[in-house]
Amino acid sequence: MFLIYINDLPNASEFFNILFADDTSLLLNDRDIQKLQKRAEDELMKVEEWFATNKMHLNSKKTKYMLFNLPKSRTFTFELKLSGIELDRVSESGDEKSVKLVGITLDENLTFKHHVDKLKIKLNKVNFILARSRTFLPKKIRLLIYNSLAGSILEFGSILYGNATMSVLDPLIKLQKKLIRNVYGVPNGSHTNKAFAELKILKLPDLIERNKCVVAHKLWYETAPKNICQDFKPIHTTTYNTRVIDRLQFDVPLCRKAGLEIAPVFAVSKSWNRLDLTIKENSKSRNL
């Protein structure tokens, strides 16, 4: 009922709205920081008016904002006010360093470090269960525990947090190996290649790459939502194109700034372009 009640909120301002249960996130972007601040304040006033018209109150104490920027960019002076009250900013230098959006923990530089830290806490709990149970539970049951608990944790949001740097992902990769050793029943420090193969579990880097290609497959054959597909442009080729390498390839935009490679339009496109042409062609009429 609440979602029906606020269904026309996206029409009240220029903000891009993300409505999830009783949580609402408003997104706005601009190349000029001063223009962004002015636009954000103006649009917040429109949102506040919409709430008042619909007999609701926008609580400024519970409303926070985050300024997304590239790592190592210069610091900007940025303030937002609502009803004359300055809103709290979520940043690395503030009390709150991250915010959760639809299950993904975001920081202002999109390093996904805080998200990975939370994944490690969850996976360590699963590892504790597996370590304690490996002496009396059969391998089949331990594998079931891994797939239902740890596997689902690693899968969720992997095409986003999977674009983090290796220094951020490496502890997660090592933790997955600990989990696999406990599932397979081998001592700590043992090689895990055989265990991954026999258990039919993908290593984290391969899992991330696979999931990017699955998303890219939906984008290429336009089975994903149209508003997402339109951001991914294929390289235009003719039927008689002699450059086989250009067939079934996304046009990857030129990236002039370091850090932008984490955007799905870059990361997903590159994963698809790396995929073997035979796999792309054979998967046309079915799921990848």
Enumerate the language-model features and the residues they cover:
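Active-site palm subdomain of RNA-directed nucleic acid polymerases
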Residues: 1-28
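Short, charged alpha-helical motifs in flexible N/C-terminal segments and linkers
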Residues: 48-67, 100, 168-234
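Basic, alpha-helical interaction scaffolds
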Residues: 14, 90-160
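Hydrophobic packing residues in well-ordered alpha-helices of helical domains and bundles
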Residues: 37-40, 44, 58, 116, ...
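Amphipathic alpha-helical
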Residues: 226-267
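Short, conserved micro-motifs composed of acidic
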Residues: 42, 57-97
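Catalytic palm subdomain of template-directed nucleic-acid polymerases
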Residues: 25-49, 70-71
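Short, conserved catalytic/metal-binding micro-motifs enriched in Asp/Glu and His
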Residues: 1, 21-25, 51, 99-109, ...
